[in-house]
Amino acid sequence: MKTQMLSAQRPEDIAAAAGLLRNGKLVAIPTETVYGLGANGLDENAVLRIFEAKGRPQDNPLILHISEPKELESICHDIPAQAWLLAEHFWPGPLTMVLPVRDLVPKRTTAGLDTVAVRCPKTAATRELIRLAGVPIAAPSANRSGKPSTTTAAHVLHDMDGRIEAILDGGPCEVGVESTIVDLTGERPRLLRPGGVTPEELRALLGELDIDRAVLGQISNDAVVRAPGMKYKHYAPSAEVYIISGSSEAAARYIRRRFGPGDAVLCFAEELPLYDGCNPTAYGSENDVRTLSAGLFAALRDLDRPDIRTIYARCPEGGGVAYAVGNRLKKAA
């Protein structure tokens, strides 16, 4: 199979991608978070191809993407007022909600659960694609399972060339880490995965928010999960990743004492002079944490090379988007 490159800047290419999706084909789609591996979320055979192309465990549910908030009612029932409040404030955008699912959604999409994860992406071309396709699009990150997520079309082509029909190139992703996921099916809202919408923003709107044990790394691989990204090793290059926190100077002393052949450093831009001779890669500025989220996966992919066996990764501290960046680094380690 030859993977076709399409442009999100061309309306005819968006229409062509929509036609492929309607006919059960796989198309990688751009979003503000990461690229998604898209299929008709109501077509069980098309959804199966997602799992096969990624090498993804089938107990890992998928996120359905819709073109506008009102489409939520077609795939979910018993939607609480909190969901509409969140949609009003954060859709279109990097927030996914877990809600009770209607019967028309295949069990393969939901991993057999009675709930489904849904989001309305910010990227206008992708919303138009979904509208033209006329179906919700199931789309996990467009990378081989376990590897760093894809934030450019070139990343997708590296992982998926010959495995999928097309890639819709929308340029680099703005946010750079996957969406925040919040479960609204319990007595209290529960954060299942941190992302572009922060816990602080959710609490300010909802008044309460529990943090799932999976976010804290306290979940076993035999646990049943309600959303993607909650178990299994994710986002990882082939090298061993060691997370290094603390002050810049103390971290540099620690790393330099241990640094050897086959090692690399993933650090903040301000720290590059501290790692002269240590093969450093900066993934953003410590003073602008959103540059860290935007640059993280691209940097991990750059360091996913046969000559690199160990990566010492500097991890931002604190809440907000830094919490999501730290979560992804810990999943990679």
Describe these PLM feature segments:
Residues 1-333:
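Active-site-adjacent structural elements in enzyme catalytic cores
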